[in-house]
Amino acid sequence: MEIQEISKLAIEALEDIKGKDIIELDTSKLTSLFQRMIVATGDSNRQVKALANSVQVKLKEAGVDIVGSEGHESGEWVLVDAGDVVVHVMLPAVRDYYDIEALWGGQKPSFAVGAAKPWSAV
């Protein structure tokens, strides 16, 4: 399965569970570890876990190997590693605090650019 197809499936899985502020970054020129990074936000720990689980289930059904997954215990930041595609699902405050989009050359989604945020990073 091609990387674009895997990314599309992961994004669909996030949208199915109402993931917010979903972005996809092409990291192929930045690292050889993975080709795409997808970042999404969930409103609660429970939703973050459900979003990550949805990604895992949808990718497994399509025959994609899941290398690993971390963060299900707390549900604040869950990572799903599907080899060439890595998915990060976070609570809003965690996403704002770590700003991994900027670390990988992306832009913060519109909710963080000049918009009033309903949270603040500690």
Curated annotation (Swiss-Prot):
Main localization of the protein? Answer: cytoplasm
User: Gene3D superfamilies recorded for this chain?
Assistant: Beta Polymerase, domain 2
Q: How does the annotation summarize its subunit structure?
A: Interacts with ribosomal protein uL14 (rplN).
The family annotation for this protein states: Belongs to the Iojap/RsfS family.
Q: Which InterPro entries match?
A: Iojap/RsfS/C7orf30, NT_sf
Give the protein's recorded name: Ribosomal silencing factor RsfS
Cross-referenced NCBIfam families, in alphabetical order?
rsfS_iojap_ybeB
Against Pfam families, the record matches this protein to: RsfS
Q: Which GO terms describe its biological process?
A: cytosolic ribosome assembly; negative regulation of ribosome biogenesis; negative regulation of translation
Q: Which PANTHER family match?
A: IOJAP SUPERFAMILY ORTHOLOG, MITOCHONDRIAL ASSEMBLY OF RIBOSOMAL LARGE SUBUNIT PROTEIN 1
Please give the GO cellular component terms listed in this UniProt entry: cytoplasm
| GO MF term list | ribosomal large subunit binding
List keywords of the entry alphabetically.
Answer: Cytoplasm, Repressor, Translation regulation
- What is the protein's species of origin? Chromobacterium violaceum (strain ATCC 12472 / DSM 30191 / JCM 1249 / CCUG 213 / NBRC 12614 / NCIMB 9131 / NCTC 9757 / MK)
Tell me the domain of life. Bacteria
Q: Where in the cell is it found?
A: Cytoplasm
Its biological purpose is as follows: Functions as a ribosomal silencing factor. Interacts with ribosomal protein uL14 (rplN), blocking formation of intersubunit bridge B8. Prevents association of the 30S and 50S ribosomal subunits and the formation of functional ribosomes, thus repressing translation.
